[in-house]
Each structure stands twice: as C-alpha cells, then as structure tokens.
Amino acid sequence: MCEVVEVQGVTSEETIETIMEFSKRLGKVAVRCDDNVGYVVDRLRIPYLFEAMRLHERGHGSMFDIDVAMKLGANYKLGPFELCDHIGLDNVKNMMDGWRKAEPDNPLYAPVATLDRLVSEGKLGKKTGAGFFKYKSKREGWSKR
C-alpha cells in the first residue's frame, strides 16, 4: 500500500494517475489522500498508539495484555507497544512532538510521560534492545517485562 498525496492546486490529475498506475505495476495498492499531517495511515495509527500508552499509564492494563488484546481482539499483527518498539520510540516521539507543534490544542498529541522517559534513557525499541519491551537481539520477539 502506498499513499498518493495530492497537494490541492499543485498536483495535476495526470501526475496522480501516473503515480497510481506506477504503484499498481509495483504490486502496490495506492490510495489517494490530501496533504495533511500524517496523511491517512499515521493520522489514525499514531493517536491509537498514544492512547494505548495512556491506557497503560492510567493502570487499565499491562503493556503485554494491551498488546495481546489488540492482536486477538482487533486482528492486528502487532500490538501497540510492539509496534512502537518496531517503529522506534524516538521516531514515535518525533511524530508526536511535530504534530503537537502543528496542533498545540489537540489533546491527542499531549505528551506521554512513559514515552518521554524511555526516549531520554536511550531505550528506543528493537534497535537498541529495549523500549517498552526488552529484546535479546534485533531479530527476536519481545519478552514480558
């Protein structure tokens, strides 16, 4: 899947059609979207990840249980904490910080203490061997903390 971003008044229909066709030749499913923060996928995914972190911070579930619930209950391949560790906690934090700067009054982008702490400690996820979960190596799965 790839997001084909259309900038209103700038991107021609011919350009969009060319990119859509090229994506199809690559075996990708292309979706059109306008130029907004996060486009479609990250605009939906990142607030979901933040809410999972807040849910855990409020004591409503362990990281492990929240991950299992979303994998089994929503048929997601990765739970939110696994996904954050896969993306890189520094990358997730950078997205949050950028979106908060763009939309400072939006509560979806309020800081998450646990994320801020882990990033400040250098625990960035799989790439450093620790994030929300600990990893024996970059290729192995997570272990319950």
Predicted feature residues:
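Short, charged, surface-exposed secondary-structure boundary motifs
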Residues: M1-E3, T18
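NAD(P)-dependent Rossmann-like dehydrogenase/reductase catalytic/cofactor-binding core
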Residues: V10-D35, Y39, P47, M53-R145
